[in-house]
Amino acid sequence: MDNLTKVTEFLLMEFSGIWELQVLHAGLFLLIYLAVLVGNLLIIAVITLDQHLHTPMYFFLKNLSVLDLCYISVTVPKSIRNSLTRRSSISYLGCVAQVYFFSAFASAELAFLTVMSYDRYVAICHPLQYRAVMTSGGCYQMAVTTWLSCFSYAAVHTGNMFREHVCRSSVIHQFFRDIPHVLALVSCEVFFVEFLTLALSSCLVLGCFILMMISYFQIFSTVLRIPSGQSRAKAFSTCSPQLIVIMLFLTTGLFAALGPIAKALSIQDLVIALTYTVLPPFLNPIIYSLRNKEIKTAMWRLFVKIYFLQK
């Protein structure tokens, strides 16, 4: 049987034992975080201030931007601070809070991508019924239900992981509180914990994956029937990057959850963790919004207004 200890804090592995690499890691993460911050705040401001963008699609894009800011803020700022100060500890309650919010925002990310794929399905496959199906009230209900469901899921998920205040070890073999690595430390009825965590995660991921694939299958089927080759190419160029990000997010997240937990920080674990924690918030503004002509036009109008107001 593993030795059990009552812990009050956890220790994280450093990104590198070399100070210069620690600074490089902090600088790179800071640039990524600032890019995500600026991009998403700009999208939120533009969609909020421009009346032309008060439609269901942009309502969900604004929710996704808010979510991306929250999602990346759970892990990256703390990681930057740890690298610069070389302080790798986090309190037990701090770890619980971070796991809770990470679970909530990760599940909400998946849920909102699913809702947005359904929105595109209705817009492309049933354009005449779009306004009747995607009403303002219906969109608000979907958004509120998504947020509440994901925070409830995170509460069950986190509560199940931290049922007892004892662990096998206080050292997390990752440079942030990655859920699989934390799960490997908790000691309470390990098999039951892992089984329930896997069951909850599998139901969420599989359900969202099936719904997204159905939506995109219908979208591509409709697009292939479009007579104009230029319109087909435009539709494919819009949907393909979205699918790539979704598949990266799902596959790396599942691999991290189902794969073996390494005894030390490895390059493979690092790449996988970065792919599903940093990459989606970084790419989503580019793929879903900044490549969008209406968003770029609205940004231009906003910049023009600001320019003339200052004169």
UniProtKB/Swiss-Prot annotation:
Segments crossing the lipid bilayer: 27-47, 56-76, 93-113, 142-162, 190-210, 242-262, 270-290
SS bonds (residue pairs): C95-C188
Glycan-bearing residues: N3
CDD domains, per the entry: 7tmA_OR14-like
MF (Gene Ontology): G protein-coupled receptor activity; odorant binding; olfactory receptor activity
CC terms in the record's Gene Ontology section: plasma membrane
Spans within the Extracellular topological domain: 1-26, 77-92, 163-189, 263-269
Entry's localization field: Cell membrane
Principal cellular location given in the protein's record: membrane
Highest taxon of the lineage: Eukaryota
Membrane-protein topology: Multi-pass membrane protein
Keywords: Cell membrane, Disulfide bond, G-protein coupled receptor, Glycoprotein, Membrane, Olfaction, Receptor, Sensory transduction, Transducer, Transmembrane, Transmembrane helix
Side of membrane Cytoplasmic, spans: 48-55, 114-141, 211-241, 291-311
Pfam families: 7tm_4 (PF13853)
Coiled coil segments of this chain: none
InterPro entries, per the entry: GPCR_Rhodpsn (IPR000276), GPCR_Rhodpsn_7TM (IPR017452), Olfact_rcpt (IPR000725), Olfactory_GPCR (IPR050516)
Family, as annotated: Belongs to the G-protein coupled receptor 1 family.
Function noted in UniProt: Odorant receptor.
Official protein name in the record: Olfactory receptor 14I1
Species of provenance: Homo sapiens (Human)
Lineage summary: Eukaryota, Metazoa, Chordata, Craniata, Vertebrata
Gene name, Swiss-Prot/TrEMBL: OR14I1
